[in-house]
Each structure stands twice: as structure tokens, then as C-alpha cells.
Amino acid sequence: MAVGKNKRVSKGKKGAKKKVIDPFSRKEWYNLKAPVTFNVRNFGQTLVTKTIGTKLATDGLKGRVFEMSLADLNADEDQAYRKIKLSCEDVQGRNCLTDFHGTSVTRDKLCSLIRKNYSLIEAFADVKTLDGYNLRMFCVGYTKRRPGQLKSTCYVRSSKVRLIHKKMVAVMTNEASNSTLKELVKKVIPESIGKEIEKACKSIFPLQNVLVRKIKVLKKPKFDLTKLMESHNYSGEEEGHTLKVKESENATNLLTAELQSS
């Protein structure tokens, strides 16, 4: 028998179940708001740990990047091949105000455009928009058979590839430098930049299926809350409207009626 051992002291059972705490009880939901560039403004919700002491919930939300299909943001299934990245820039109440953070084309779309006996031409350019965003734009295009061509293959010489590269970079730089980020996104979605490249390269070699494959945001300007609010058309007027009810002509003030009767 061990010295000093007290048999009367009851021991706790080994392997006793610990109290299970639901992890979701410490979290809360926030709504995600897309800029006015897209048709669907409320595109989802996100979870974040509740504010505890000096750790604010909003600090955990700012900087988060969300990737969505353009088909969901514009309610158009024909645009499902393009993905859009939106980053949370500010939090207003329970709403996360997001801004454009990049775009890319799905791998399925790119693989569907590749054809045998045709040349693939790629180019990229570092551009800067009017509102101070530094972007890197990637472009891709494919050769096209000339009318009346008898040759089965449609390859292009390296000398012409270099000329097409220069045209692609020039068009992307020109389109970005003469527009804001919002205007540039509106050009990328309907593939208007790709059509401009096709027109510019027509004299060198005909191209087809030209599109902006990817856009990366390299550097953003200093955060401006006013511009972010403008991109969301956000105002406090959505809450607390003053309700004006038109009084009917037959209605009579009770106090006036009492005075008249007396």
C-alpha cells in the first residue's frame, strides 16, 4: 500500500466526455455585396468569428478574396466560362462591400478552343488604368483560315507572331490607359477588347477566338471610401425612410371638432 494514499477520495473516470462546444456559436454571417458593374448585387454570405475583446470581426473580413462565376453575377449561363475575383474592401453594418480583384477563363473553355493545325498566340502587358490600378493582362488568340485557302494547315511564321504580339500589347495598353477599372471590366465581359485585337491584326494574319484570358491586380491605389461607396451606389437612405401618408379629405381634426361642437 502506498504511503499517504486516501482510499476515500473518489477519482474521476478516465476517458470522461468533454463538453462539446458548437464552433458556429462563436461565428456570425455577413452579406457579400458586388459592385454595380454586375447585375446580381447580393452574391452570397461569409462566416467570421465574432468580435472578442480587441479582435474585431471586421478585421477578419477585410482583404478576403471571393471567386465567383460570371454566370452567377450576371444571371447569364452563357458567361459561365469566366470567373471573377472580388475582394472585401470595407464593412458597413452586416454588408461586405467588395471591389474587382481579377478575372480568369476556365480551363474547359481554353481547352475547347485549341485545334489541330492552328497556331496559338499569347501575349501579356502591364497596364495602368486612369484611377491608378496596376494590372497585368493576358491575351490569347488563334489563327484563322483565309477565305479560299486550300492548305489544310493554318500555321503562322514567327516573324508575324512577333508583329501580332506588338499589336496585342498595344491594344491592351491603349484600352486600359484610357479607361477606369469599372470601364475596363465592362469591356472585358463582352470580349470587346478581343474584337479590337482581331481588327488590328487582320492585315498581318486573320485571328479568331481572341479573348482576355486573365487579369491580375498588381497594385491598388490608396483606399478611398467615397469611391467605393460610388461603385456600390451605397447610401444610408436605404434604412429609416420617412413615411408620408396622405390624409384623406374627409378626415377632421378631433380637437377642431370638439371646439366647433362647444
UniProtKB/Swiss-Prot annotation:
It comes from the Eukaryota. One of its GO terms (cellular component) is cytosolic small ribosomal subunit. Transmembrane segments: none annotated. It is found in: Cytoplasm. Its main location: cytoplasm. Keywords: Cytoplasm, Ribonucleoprotein, Ribosomal protein. One of its GO terms (biological process) is translation. Pfam families: Ribosomal_S3Ae. GO terms for molecular function: structural constituent of ribosome. InterPro entries: Ribosomal_eS1, Ribosomal_eS1_CS, Ribosomal_eS1_euk. Belongs to the eukaryotic ribosomal protein eS1 family. Component of the small ribosomal subunit. Mature ribosomes consist of a small (40S) and a large (60S) subunit. The 40S subunit contains about 33 different proteins and 1 molecule of RNA (18S). The 60S subunit contains about 49 different proteins and 3 molecules of RNA (25S, 5.8S and 5S). This is Small ribosomal subunit protein eS1. It comes from Theileria annulata.
